[in-house]
Amino acid sequence: MDQNWMNNTTVIVTGASGGMGKGIAESLIVDHGCTVIGIARSEEKMKKVVEELGPNAEKFSYKLFDVSVEQNWIDFAKYLEDNDIHPDILVNNAGILPKFDRFEHYSMADIEKAMNINFYSAVYSIHTLLPMI
C-alpha cells in the first residue's frame, strides 16, 4: 500500500484537546498530511492546540461539543453536510477514566457519565457519520 494514502484525507478526532487525541491529531497533520477536525469541549485547550501546530494549523479546525449527546452528533453531521465536508476517517478517542476506587463506591451518576462518554459517544458518532464516510 502506498505510504502516502492518508495524504489529503479528512479525519475527525474526538478528544483532540489533550492527551492521546491531541497527539493523534498532530501526527495525522504533520506526519501524514491529513486535514483534521478536532472535537472537544474546551475552546481554551483547542486554541492551544492550534497555537502549537504553528504553520500546520491551517490543516486543523475544531468544533466544540459534548460527544455524549446524540443531538450534538446530528448537528455536527448537518454542519459537515452544509459545508460540503466529506470525512474519510473517524477516530473515536474521547474518553474519561474515573478515579480508581472500589466499585461499590462509584455513584450511578459516575458510571453513567463514563458509559455516556466512553461507549455511547462512539455509538452516536458511528451511527450518525458512517453514511458520510
What are these regions (language model features)?
Residues 101-103, 107-113:
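Substrate-binding pocket helix/loop in short-chain dehydrogenase/reductase
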Residues 126-127:
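A short, exposed helix-loop element centered on a Lys and neighboring polar residues
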Residues 32-48:
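Conserved glycine-rich Rossmann-like NAD(P)H-binding loop of the short-chain dehydrogenase/reductase
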